[in-house]
Swiss-Prot record:
Swiss-Prot/TrEMBL catalytic activity: uridine(13) in tRNA = pseudouridine(13) in tRNA
GO molecular function: RNA binding; tRNA pseudouridine(13) synthase activity
Enzyme active site: 81
CDD domains on file: PseudoU_synth_EcTruD
Protein name: tRNA pseudouridine synthase D
GO biological process: tRNA pseudouridine synthesis
UniProt cross-references to HAMAP family, sorted A to Z: TruD
Enzyme class: isomerase
Organism expressing this protein natively: Helicobacter pylori (strain P12)
Amino acid sequence: MNLNFMPLLHAYNHASIDFHFNSSARDFCVHEVPLYEFSNTGEHAVIQVRKSGLSTLEMLQIFSQILGVKIAELGYAGLKDKNALTTQFISLPKKYAPLLEKNTHNLQERNLKILSLNYHHNKIKLGHLKGNRFFMRFKKMTPLNAQKTKQVLEQIARFGMPNYFGSQRFGKFNDNHKEGLKILQNQTKFAHQKLNAFLISSYQSYLFNALLSKRLEISKIISAFSLKENLEFFKQNNLSVNSNALKALKNQAHPFKILEGDVMCHYPYGKFFDALELGKEGERFLNKEAAPTGLLDGKKALYAKNLSFEIEKEFQHNLLSSHAKTLGSRRFFWVFAENVTSQYMKEKAQFELGFYLPKGSYASALLKKIKHEKGEKYDKF
């Protein structure tokens, strides 16, 4: 497979929308929503921290330096953007809590502010969040483009959007996935095991994005072309589909088509199950009750069946499925933005947007859906 970045297909077919977005603390805000309520008792202090101009890892280093706590003792649910105003929850051993108030000024000098202090019985771990609330401000937005943007947002609110991994996964030079493959091939290795694991996960992410783009292409072809043309397309691609199955696929109201053998998952979380009754699953997908998932290949990955598997197998890799430390998983192909709000200020030519996404989903993916830039290969922030 070609490992160079290829343009990823967009979900919707509107023309490009021109505006300016600057990923900065003024124009981009991220607010973490915790997975559970904190009990206010326990051996771990839980602080809600607001930061700007710092990555999560840089923030942890500052806490370590100022409080004397080891970085390994700090818990966090996920990485937050550096070029944004973000809030997130951090856990640390209870004994360090008294030092927080004493060092308020030192922390504020480093662009960190403690918003709240609580306690809990366990350390926060990666993935311990429901999702994130986002705010974005677009500039140089004309009234016509504001109207187009609202129309796109209506589509996204109704149908959702592709759950592509964002550029954070692939690094400054968009080559993390290549390094991950080299690690699997024993061509390179780093001393830090977490770095090796992250780079391998970048390769998984690259394959997932490519698979999702392929599935979008197939969905668009099913919707746009006649039954006869579709039968010819599937035949040329060595995919076995009869005319009745294709009719059923064309009748699915959602733009992303559920295929026979897809691995579904209750949305926004729940158990995996196979798509057997496509009409029924299509309705559940449309109602945001369940969604199809894509492969993150690994030793214990759950694979699709039938037609879905025939497409998916092109994006599997035996080095992932045989790698002892890469267990594999599945990820929603599609996610639904919630609580979408927008406001256009004509006199300032500015458009403000707020929305919520579940954990693991990227605001940059929604930005791409709106801008719809031709030839776009990866996210701008």
